Amino acid sequence: MATNRRVSRVAELIKREVSQMLINGIKDDRVGTGMVSVTDVDVSGDLQHAKIYVSIYGTEEAKAETMAGLKSATGFVRSELGARVRLRRTPEVTFIEDRSIERGTKVLTLLNKLENARSLDDIPSADDSLDED
């Protein structure tokens, strides 16, 4: 069992290496359909499994196509990680679509709408100022 510090260091290293692979290592055209970025990597305590969370910008169709390309490139990514990262065993790689950025954007949009509606309610109308006289 690896220490928490080692697990987090390995996760950061995997994140950096997979990000580099997304830029110029994976030749599958489907991966380039949507803009892809690695948002997080969870590595198990025994360093045998790595969940790679990716954020994909684009249409739902482009996202599905990109995820299919990433899933088919899993073997390549694992073998490249084995060559680039010095570990006794290369972890099994799983790509998971991270929709937290989308959800965050939706929440911010809703908050902005509420703030705009509230500020419109706070502005006194011309009729209100005439009634006070």
Swiss-Prot record:
It is found in: Cytoplasm. One of its GO terms (molecular function) is ribosomal small subunit binding. One of its GO terms (biological process) is maturation of SSU-rRNA. InterPro entries: KH_dom-like_a/b, RbfA, RbfA_dom_sf, Ribosome-bd_factorA_CS. Gene3D superfamilies: 3.30.300.20. Keywords: Cytoplasm, Ribosome biogenesis. Its main location: cytoplasm. The keyword Cytoplasm applies. It comes from the Bacteria. The keyword Cytoplasm applies. Monomer. Binds 30S ribosomal subunits, but not 50S ribosomal subunits or 70S ribosomes. Belongs to the RbfA family. HAMAP family: RbfA. One of several proteins that assist in the late maturation steps of the functional core of the 30S ribosomal subunit. Associates with free 30S ribosomal subunits (but not with 30S subunits that are part of 70S ribosomes or polysomes). Required for efficient processing of 16S rRNA. May interact with the 5'-terminal helix region of 16S rRNA. This is Ribosome-binding factor A. It comes from Trichormus variabilis (strain ATCC 29413 / PCC 7937). The gene is rbfA.
